[in-house]
Structure formats: structure tokens, C-alpha cells
Amino acid sequence: MRTRSAPDDTTAPGRASAAGYLDGQLLVAMPGMADERFARSVIYLCAHSAEGAMGIIVNKPAADLNMPDLLVQLDIIRQDDAIRLPNRVGHMPVLMGGPVESSRGFVLHSPDFHIDQSTLLIDDGICLTATVEILRAIAAGTGPRDAVLALGYAGWQPGQLESEIQANGWLHCPADPDLIFNAALDAKYDRALRAIGIEPAMLSMSAGHA
């Protein structure tokens, strides 16, 4: 998977679906994914058009980084204030969203929070905001009801994702906000497969005998 900037054409979800694009859906890696960075990945596809695609891995933690430490590093809170964060904020995982711009934060969140000119409504249940203001709101307890923070994203060149899907690299299914925001990280892959109608154990057996 080559890295690239996020596509400029963030087509509205309804028109994207009509054109055969998959923004607002989950990509689920097939067993035997050639690129180890994406093995057993579940990716929420934020943008997909003729210009390419951009998504966030939602089931892999960033190495050695938690939310309180990140907020301290960004000077959003002081070290002494970390223990005073709301419980759900203090335990919010920081995800490894993908290999592109891996030092940049992206927040997928519920649509009850919006920043003008910064928040992209991807579908009825999920938005994307990539500014420090949303982290300040989360730290203050005034952010969205549901949110996950990821560092970096996955990007595809024009036509690249379509080719990978045709080569059986990815399955896809409608996104479930509960899976993205509430499921345990290590349960998301199997849960996404079951949403497609595939029992994970059977898929693993089939891959082993391919």
C-alpha cells in the first residue's frame, strides 16, 4: 500500500454510494494480507472517490502511548491534571490509524459534536475531526459522547483500493458505530467478520487450506 495524502474530493455519502464508492463502510482484511501492517485490520473508510481513498484503522493500539500522556505532550493538560481526567477519557485508547502522517491525530466521533469548517459528517452516526480543539473538548468533558483517537491514516492511490478488493485483499460491510466506539480492540476483527456473515474460525481454516 503506497502512502499518499487524503483525497481532496470528499464526496457526500449518498452520492458516493450511488457511484459505487465505499466511504462510510468498514474494510476488513482477509487472512493472508500481504502487508503485515494491515493484517487483521478493520478500517473505517472516511473518503473514497475517483481521487483515491482514505481510512482509519480502528482496532490497533498505538505503541506505548495513552490518552493522558498524549494530552500532556500536546500541552492540553498538565501532568498533575492527568489523574483528574474523566474516567472514560483517561482510559480512551490511542489507535494506530495507519502509516500515513502517523504523527497527526484524527478523531472519529458521534455527530453530537461539531466544529465549523473542521468536522466532516461521513454518515449519520460517525464524523471525523482532525483539529486540536476536539481534544481540548474531550479533555474538558465537553467533547462528543463517543470518540476514538487515531494517529495516522491509511491511503490509497486512484483505483488502488478497487484493485486490492478485486484481488480478495479486503471484505467490506456497513459500519456499526457501536463496533467502532465501544467494542474491545481485540474483538473488533471477529465482530466485523460476523457482521459480514463469516465465522472467523471457518475463514481461518479456509485460508490454511488455500
Swiss-Prot record:
<dbReference type="GO" id="GO:0005829">
    <property type="term" value="C:cytosol"/>
</dbReference>
<dbReference type="Pfam" id="PF02622">
    <property type="entry name" value="DUF179"/>
</dbReference>
<protein>
    <recommendedName>
        <fullName>UPF0301 protein M446_6268</fullName>
    </recommendedName>
</protein>
<dbReference type="InterPro" id="IPR003774">
    <property type="entry name" value="AlgH-like"/>
</dbReference>
<comment type="similarity">
    <text>Belongs to the UPF0301 (AlgH) family.</text>
</comment>
